[in-house]
């Protein structure tokens, strides 16, 4: 019988541990030398691809962080202490005056509206407005259905279709892109994709190639044949490291996309070769670890979309909220680049400016649609601007090159959070103009008046809740906000009149936190929300719950507002009074 080498047997566990260590180290490392504002080699738990390894690393990371936090009085003080003296000595409000000098004189490129629709959102300015006059207010009621095309699968298609050379191109609820005859609605071709195609949109270039993301890839397809453009990337595809679902833009020979890194990536339009990337986060050494936890750099994704000033070679980006929706204990500070409109100069590869609407967002007030490039008149001169309707009901009107607001706004001192470790911003912006197109914060007067019974029911339901202008969320106590404003559909702007049209919703919603009892969890609190409804299932605030609003962007005044959407049974009972129309 052969003899076993006892020393070798004893070494096997050591070898296994070493192999696991090496494999884990390999998983933690990521190499990408195309970022111009980020290190080529990063060492982070978020780089880990293997789910079992990621779970192990997170557990070790959280455990070590908790031990470090429990032993460090300095870190405890840093986490829990808020400078209330500084807060109390601050003024209640600060007026920020509108920019009046050195405005961006218009290059007249946005004076007219598009007469075609070769990109979701209408064009690269994303103004979603057509100058075609064949269909108008005098004959729209005479329209009849010419044809209907039914998808093979059910689901939502958020990105609107595009039109080119008598064909309609649209993504399906499944994983494919189709071309239809505009005249008959017959399918010409269907191209399967790896992921869900063109979730937020697609575009077609003058080279007759269609460009879109399927979350996993950037694709180029010939619009005539439906075949992949084999000269682009690898057989018509570019494998992406990070998810992409928004519509690309094209500037000269570059095609530009926004990813969930979050980042901007620039590729050669012909070959698909990567040129450079820009990381849309501001990482500082001061915020590597906070409260024993790794600083939460997640979120802030540009999922709302991007637009392009082709002549000036500038990409404009709208971003989402940082980290988790309703709590920010692991991400102190303003969370730069989140809840913002950002201007990125493609020639210099630098950020020209960024304008943040909500600081340290814990209410889910991200900017959900792409910025719109248009112009308004100031002091008799036409000025190029960037416009962004938001979930908070604001309309940001910013100078195209400086990013400064063209309307006054106030910074209002807001309540501090009572959640341990939650350091909310001392101030939030309140825009005086343009006038808000949706309800911005809940008040008692907003309680439903559909019936005395409904009023009583909702009053009882919210009696212990908090509400107000940017009132922070609490643990086990509900906070009321209006969930709605402008969603991912965004707005339309008539460039010839500087008029914006936006649909919005006003849904009263409970937000609250619950303490996480799970040992070594990365998150201290879980985030929760619930739409407030009466006993019959209707929203708990006064109707209308949705509006269509027209706003004059030159003076910031609302032209008109009409209810948009209905419950048919309430309409029949004449519950709607159209008091806001």
Q: Where are the model-predicted features located?
A:
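N-terminal Sec-pathway targeting helices
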Residues: 2-19
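Hydrophobic alpha-helical membrane-insertion segments, chiefly the h-region
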Residues: 19-29
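N-terminal pre-domain segments of enzymes
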Residues: 31-133, 426-437, 445-448, 453-458
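Repeat-blade elements of multi-bladed beta-propeller folds
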Residues: 117-121, 156-176, 195-217, 242-264, ...
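Asp/Glu-centered strand-loop micro-motifs enriched in Gly/Pro and often flanked by an aromatic residue
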Residues: 122-124, 130-169, 187-193, 475-483
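Extracytoplasmic/lumenal domain signature
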Residues: 138-152, 177-197, 206-207, 218-242, ...
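Long, low-complexity segments enriched in small/aliphatic residues
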Residues: 428-507, 547
């Amino acid at each position: 019988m052969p003899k076993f080498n006892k020393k070798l047997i004893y070494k096997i566990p050591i070898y296994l541990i070493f192999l696991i260590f090496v494999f884990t180290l390999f998983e933690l490392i990521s190499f990408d030398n195309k970022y111009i504002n980020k290190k080529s080699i990063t060492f982070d738990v978020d780089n880990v691809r293997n789910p079992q390894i990621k779970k192990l690393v997170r557990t070790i990371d959280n455990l070590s962080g908790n031990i470090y936090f429990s032993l460090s009085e300095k870190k405890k003080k840093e986490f829990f202490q808020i400078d209330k003296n500084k807060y109390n000595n601050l003024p209640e409000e600060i007026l920020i005056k509108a920019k009046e000098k050195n405005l961006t004189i218009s290059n007249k490129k946005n004076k007219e509206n598009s007469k075609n629709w070769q990109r979701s959102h209408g064009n690269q300015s994303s103004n979603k407005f057509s100058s075609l006059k064949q269909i108008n207010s005098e004959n729209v009621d005479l329209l009849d259905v010419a044809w209907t095309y039914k998808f093979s699968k059910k689901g939502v298609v958020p990105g609107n279709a595009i039109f080119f050379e008598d064909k309609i191109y649209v993504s399906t609820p499944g994983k494919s892109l189709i071309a239809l005859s505009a005249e008959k609605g017959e399918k010409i071709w269907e191209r399967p994709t790896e992921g869900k195609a063109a979730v937020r949109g697609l575009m077609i270039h003058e080279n007759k190639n269609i460009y879109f993301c399927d979350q996993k890839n950037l694709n180029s397809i010939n619009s005539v044949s439906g075949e992949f453009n084999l000269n682009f990337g690898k057989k018509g595809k570019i494998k992406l490291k990070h998810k992409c679902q928004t519509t690309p833009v094209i500037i000269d020979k570059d095609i530009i996309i926004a990813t969930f890194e979050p980042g901007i990536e620039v590729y050669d339009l012909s070959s698909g070769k990567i040129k450079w990337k820009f990381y849309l986060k501001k990482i500082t050494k001061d915020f590597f670890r906070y409260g024993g936890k790794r600083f939460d750099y997640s979120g802030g994704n540009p999922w709302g979309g991007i637009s392009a000033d082709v002549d000036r070679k500038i990409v404009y980006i709208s971003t989402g909220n940082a980290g988790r929706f309703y709590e920010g204990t692991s991400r102190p500070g303003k969370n730069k680049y989140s809840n913002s409109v950002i201007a990125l100069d493609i020639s210099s590869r630098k950020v020209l400016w960024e304008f943040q609407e909500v600081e340290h967002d814990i209410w889910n007030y991200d900017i959900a649609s792409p910025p719109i490039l248009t112009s308004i008149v100031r002091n008799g001169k036409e000025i190029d601007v960037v416009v962004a309707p938001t979930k908070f009901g604001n309309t940001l009107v910013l100078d195209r090159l400086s990013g400064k607001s063209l309307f006054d706004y106030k910074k209002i001192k807001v309540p501090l959070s009572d959640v341990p470790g939650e350091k909310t911003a001392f101030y939030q912006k309140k825009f005086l103009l343009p006038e808000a197109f949706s309800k911005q914060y809940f008040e008692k007067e907003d309680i439903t008046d559909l019936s005395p019974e409904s009023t009583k029911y909702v009053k009882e339901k919210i009696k212990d809740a908090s509400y107000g202008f940017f009132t922070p969320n609490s643990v086990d106590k509900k906070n009321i906000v209006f969930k709605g404003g402008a969603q991912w559909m965004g707005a339309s702007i008539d460039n010839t009149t500087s008029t914006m049209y936006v649909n919005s919703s006003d849904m009263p919603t409970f937000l609250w936190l619950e303490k996480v009892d799970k040992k070594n969890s990365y998150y201290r609190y879980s985030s929760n929300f619930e739409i407030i409804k009466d006993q019959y299932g209707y929203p708990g605030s006064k109707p209308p719950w949705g509006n269509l609003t027209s706003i004059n962007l030159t003076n910031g005044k609302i032209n008109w507002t009409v209810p948009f959407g209905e419950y048919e049974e309430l309409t029949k009972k004449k519950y709607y009074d159209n008091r806001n129309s």
